[in-house]
């Protein structure tokens, strides 16, 4: 794991992922503020902007500043689409998909614009290259060695959300499944050092779906 300090005071990080609250983009400053406020009212301290969705608008970060919510900021990358798994529905080979996105220069330029847009928000805690799996090697190296040292040198950058810099969680498992429910006592008898970017939970289906 890693320790986090705010104004010199060590904090215990709790939080959740934020994945586009409205895919039709019917977003407003009021809606952003309400959703971040809900996060704060649950006594959560960090919110992760997940890499398979949007980078949010300044109004989102303004709300995080207001309510004291730290932001774990992913870039646009998700292990679901960059060749990490065999996928018979994809026309491109796995090797080709390792190089997604197609235009690396445009991706880097977009990251530079993003950094300039939100780097002055005190809520922004650290940068993460992608969800679960690193970006193409040349992009990752450019971000690590050139973009972030030049544009936001004081903040941490990790290549992907399950980077071993953050998590060596072998109990919850960083593998590809199949997944199941862990026995509760395991969490007290098995030593683990996680900073989990996400965790599965049991959801209750609606009654109508079971009739």
Go through each PLM region and give its residues.
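Substrate-binding/catalytic cleft of secreted carbohydrate-active enzymes
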Residues: 46-211
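N-terminal carbohydrate-binding accessory modules
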Residues: 1-41
């Amino acid at each position: 794991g890693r320790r986090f300090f705010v104004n010199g005071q060590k904090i215990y990080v709790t939080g959740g992922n934020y994945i586009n609250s409205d895919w039709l983009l019917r977003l407003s400053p009021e809606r952003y503020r309400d959703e971040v406020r809900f996060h704060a009212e649950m006594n959560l301290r960090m919110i992760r902007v997940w890499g398979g969705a949007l980078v949010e608008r300044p109004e989102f970060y303004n709300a995080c500043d207001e309510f004291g919510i730290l932001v774990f900021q992913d870039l646009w990358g998700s292990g679901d689409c960059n060749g990490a798994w065999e996928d018979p529905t994809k026309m491109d080979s796995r090797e080709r998909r390792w190089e997604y996105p197609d235009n690396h220069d445009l991706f880097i330029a977009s990251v530079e614009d993003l950094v300039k847009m939100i780097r002055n928000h005190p809520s922004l805690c650290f940068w993460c290259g992608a969800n679960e799996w690193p970006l193409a090697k040349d992009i990752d190296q450019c971000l690590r060695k050139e973009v972030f040292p030049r544009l936001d040198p004081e903040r941490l950058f990790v290549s992907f959300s399950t980077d071993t810099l953050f998590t060596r969680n072998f109990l919850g498992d960083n593998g590809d499944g199949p997944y199941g429910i862990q026995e509760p006592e395991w969490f007290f008898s098995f030593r683990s050092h996680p900073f989990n970017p996400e965790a599965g939970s049991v959801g209750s289906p609606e009654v109508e779906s079971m009739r």
